[in-house]
């Protein structure tokens, strides 16, 4: 069974994203990066499955790509995501929230900026708590637990040095320590 084919929006039909997203998707479709696995699927099956195309997409492009899909593809994506994560459902709004929140946090991490007090989104209204919520949508409970353990360990190190510093960091994060520890699977 092939997954949905890549649907590349026409540059003139784009709304809030720059047309470079469409050009990037078109270059993948047209195999401009000359990836052998893309050529194989296009030559053999005359389509490019989404899971193959996703290997060439940046997180931000993948977010825009999801936005451009037909409702039926978005629904199938949510069902596939829920199945892959072993959860009952992933709602489209949750996935859209994750896709619009996580690329900015990924970029913050990639550029060695401060994650704990970062704010992203159009109104700079999404902080660490929203990042945790978005991660909970797109990753397994076990992986989220590993991340929460690492964060809790760092908070513990701060607390042992200065409880005042820990409280300032938690305030900057916009979470209580219990918000982090509640994600840890025993």
Describe the function of each predicted region.
Residues 1-186:
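Amphipathic alpha-helical interface elements
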């Amino acid at each position: 069974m092939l997954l949905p084919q890549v649907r590349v929006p026409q540059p003139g039909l784009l709304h809030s994203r720059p047309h470079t997203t469409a050009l990037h998707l078109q270059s993948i479709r047209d195999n401009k990066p000359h990836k052998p696995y893309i050529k194989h699927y296009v030559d053999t099956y005359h389509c490019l499955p989404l899971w193959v195309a996703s290997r060439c997409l940046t997180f931000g492009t993948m977010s825009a790509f999801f936005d451009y899909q037909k409702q039926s593809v978005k629904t199938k994506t949510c069902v596939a995501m829920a199945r892959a994560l072993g959860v009952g459902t992933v709602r489209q709004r949750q996935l859209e929230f994750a896709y619009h929140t996580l690329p900015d946090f990924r970029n913050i991490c990639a550029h060695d900026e401060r994650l704990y007090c970062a704010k992203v989104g159009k109104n700079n209204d999404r902080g660490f708590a929203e990042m945790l919520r978005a991660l909970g949508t797109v990753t397994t409970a076990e992986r989220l637990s590993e991340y929460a353990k690492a964060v809790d360990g760092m908070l513990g190190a701060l607390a042992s040095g200065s409880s005042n510093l820990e409280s300032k960091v938690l305030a900057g994060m916009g979470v209580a320590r219990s918000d982090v520890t509640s994600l840890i699977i025993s």
